[in-house]
């Protein structure tokens, strides 16, 4: 897979200490972008194409098993079996440096139908090696406010930003806007890596205010509180994790890896004809989730939910 030389690219931001930097705005202000929606879309496309090509090559050329089972998820599922009350499981992790504070958007109903179809196709092939993310846990991470801390630290950061400010941030992208003003995500594509599968999107370039503009504005509002923000790896990407690998037996043989790539490429070929779009926060407002979020969480567990 090659990328046109004309496409705008922007480097991802690696995880680091708390900072006053607004990486989202830096992308918009870059001379190659200048806030133009088409360039925003190109940045997301370029990142996705490079990542996908690298992963396909990894699976296709692998002399050994390319899949790494998610040990954290395996341990989490084992804890759930011993202690079915998820709240108690998360409470046991509250004092560890594994918790995050993130603003999420939920997929709309039509995208959930698409996701269900994709999950089934991959699960039918791979079997028990793949853990399917439950529907109620599916989400899109819009921006992160604090990364990998005890819950007490996250709550201190939230207090400094201010609950009223966060509420305004959530409302700014929520159902109080008319449909044509809300950012849209288009052109879904199934992405893969050694840990799992995800459905990625790119911002619609037919509107002046894109999904990335929303991310930049929300981050600006958080910084306006005086807080410094530490984030996980951040990239021009909009994706929903659909499943994670908890085994790799299927991928031990060349045929398994070949068949997996064939199914993924067939899914993506079918997706190219899809005209549906995701209007962010059209059906449900944005939400702030705080705690152990690595494997998703139900909307009812949100600390703050966007309203009008």
Where do the PLM segments sit?
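Histidine-dependent nucleotide/RNA phosphoesterase domain, centered on the 2H-phosphoesterase fold
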Residues: 2-308
